[in-house]
UniProtKB/Swiss-Prot annotation:
Pathway: Amino-acid biosynthesis; L-tryptophan biosynthesis; L-tryptophan from chorismate: step 3/5; Amino-acid biosynthesis; L-tryptophan biosynthesis; L-tryptophan from chorismate: step 4/5. The keyword Amino-acid biosynthesis applies. It catalyses: N-(5-phospho-beta-D-ribosyl)anthranilate = 1-(2-carboxyphenylamino)-1-deoxy-D-ribulose 5-phosphate; 1-(2-carboxyphenylamino)-1-deoxy-D-ribulose 5-phosphate + H(+) = (1S,2R)-1-C-(indol-3-yl)glycerol 3-phosphate + CO2 + H2O. Bifunctional enzyme that catalyzes two sequential steps of tryptophan biosynthetic pathway. The first reaction is catalyzed by the isomerase, coded by the TrpF domain; the second reaction is catalyzed by the synthase, coded by the TrpC domain. Residues 254-448 are annotated as: N-(5'-phosphoribosyl)anthranilate isomerase. It comes from the Bacteria. Its EC number is 4.1.1.48, 5.3.1.24. Residues 1-253 are annotated as: Indole-3-glycerol phosphate synthase. This is Tryptophan biosynthesis protein TrpCF. The keyword RNA-binding does not apply. The gene is trpC. It comes from Helicobacter pylori (strain J99 / ATCC 700824). In the N-terminal section; belongs to the TrpC family. In the C-terminal section; belongs to the TrpF family.
Length: 452
């Protein structure tokens, strides 16, 4: 039985014939005017974000495939973008490259199974600045011909390898940027550790992109030290809220707690934090009345709000969660039985964060089945936050996912980022005074979170 790749290549011959029939190329093709390679090197870790409507492994991924709306989001987060041009298996087109090039400022990769010089010329005419060449598809002679054609048009080339044999071939040829595909193109299975296996076989100074199977910030942080960037498509395209998906993937699921002002909540959202925390414990200096909290949640609807409760009645928690449309409740001092009871009363859209207060490793506790994650905070006199940190090294073997809280600030953020937390929970470290956030510190923190 032919593999998926073999079927694609068989159909690609027919597709290229149709492209040649439908598109007349100009005699002189303008060279690329956007530097794809340079854009990849502007940050320690770069992101090629992809426009992908469908794929052979997943079928239709994004029904509402609005190129302009996708572009608006990718402009904020992408180093470069990738546009699928394959029509049969990915529902892409070369016309999509033209549309994206007219509305995006980012260098564009033409993503296709390129077997013919016509595809590269057409991609350039449509506005592409780089092409993908796959050693699983091309022999050495054809690869070099296509590589040299692309370079003559001032285009970058992303050469894809997927195994040791292809790397051995590549090292005898020319290359520009190297992509390690984590997907087996014959079975369509993915394994992100494929990048870790193949990276040592490539030159240390090579520009390396990890492709396929990237779904989480944890995967990004695990692979980032050994590559220059990532090509990501399916994991973003499947999400309705594309901006939030980009933030979670690139920055993680971070939170600023103790919000008491609308303008602080707006600053938190603007700087790409996922969560804003509202403290409903009256003994806290950051306590906020539910009616005041409602004003904030209504004013900044796209920020996911988390309510912090300390030994409050279940009925009261459920009422506030519904009224404010909380995305999670953060619980201090509740038994497993109480958490189970609360789960029944909460809206389905509201998760439970089980707080575990920590002084030493003996305090680490398993998550109850009703909770979506554990939040580790410092054990102290006050439940609901003490503004001091604990020895984070004891979390080295903690089960994920978990959030980390307790005395986080700009001075210890680098150490905190080494902990494998789903996200970090900031509060007093970003304040002018209790409940009053410092927008400059929020901005500075956002920059640090992206510096990897």
């Amino acid at each position: 039985m032919p593999s998926v790749l073999e079927n694609i290549l068989k159909d690609k011959l027919l597709e290229v014939a149709v492209l040649k029939k439908n598109h007349a190329l100009p005699i002189n093709i303008a060279p690329s005017d956007r530097d794809f390679k340079k854009a990849l090197l502007e940050k320690k870790t770069s992101f090629i974000l992809e426009y992908k409507k469908a794929s052979p492994s997943k079928g239709l991924i994004r029904k509402d495939f609005d190129l302009l709306e996708i572009t608006k989001t990718y402009e904020k987060f992408a180093s470069c973008v990738s546009v699928l041009a394959d029509s049969k298996y990915f529902l892409g087109s070369y016309e999509n490259i033209k549309i994206v090039s007219q509305h995006s400022t980012k260098p564009i990769l033409c993503k296709d199974f390129i077997i013919d010089a016509f595809q590269i010329k057409l991609a350039r005419v449509m506005g592409s600045n780089a092409v993908l060449l796959m050693l699983s598809v091309l022999d050495d002679k054809n690869y070099l011909e296509l590589f040299n054609l692309a370079k003559s048009l001032n285009m970058s080339v992303l050469t894809e390898v997927s195994n040791q044999q292809e790397i051995e071939r590549l090292l005898k040829l020319q290359y520009d940027i190297i992509g390690i595909n984590n997907r087996d193109l014959h079975t369509l299975k993915t394994d992100i550790f494929h990048t870790l296996e193949l990276r040592p076989l490539l030159p240390k100074d090579a520009i390396i992109i990890s492709e396929s199977g990237i779904y989480s910030h944890a995967q990004i942080k695990a692979l980032a030290p050994c590559v220059n960037g990532f090509l990501v498509g399916s994991s973003l395209m499947k999400e309705k809220d594309l901006k939030k998906a980009c933030i979670k993937l690139i920055l993680g699921e971070n939170k600023v707690c103790g919000l008491t002002r609308i303008k602080d909540a707006k600053a938190v959202y603007k700087n790409h934090f996922i969560y804003g925390g509202l403290i409903f414990e009256k003994s806290s200096p950051r306590y906020i009345k539910p009616k005041e909290a409602l004003k904030i949640t209504k004013a900044v609807k796209k920020l996911d709000f988390v309510g912090v409760f300390v030994k409050d009645k279940i009925k009261k928690i459920a009422k506030i969660a519904k009224k404010l449309d909380l995305k999670a409740v953060q619980l201090y001092g509740y038994s497993q039985k109480e958490i189970a009871q609360l789960k029944k009363s909460l809206p389905k859209t509201c998760a439970i964060w089980q707080v575990v207060s920590v002084a030493d490793s003996k305090d680490l506790a398993p998550k109850t089945k009703e909770a979506s994650l554990i939040l580790y905070d410092t054990k102290g006199d006050k439940m609901g936050g003490n503004g001091v940190s604990f020895d984070w090294e004891i979390l080295e073997n903690a089960k994920t996912p978990f959030m980390l809280a307790g005395g986080l600030n700009l001075d210890n953020i680098q150490k905190a980022l080494k902990i494998k937390a789903l996200g970090l929970d900031f509060n007093s470290g970003l304040e002018i005074s209790p409940g009053i956030k410092n927008k400059d510190k929020i901005k500075q923190l956002a920059r640090i979170l992206r510096e990897y």
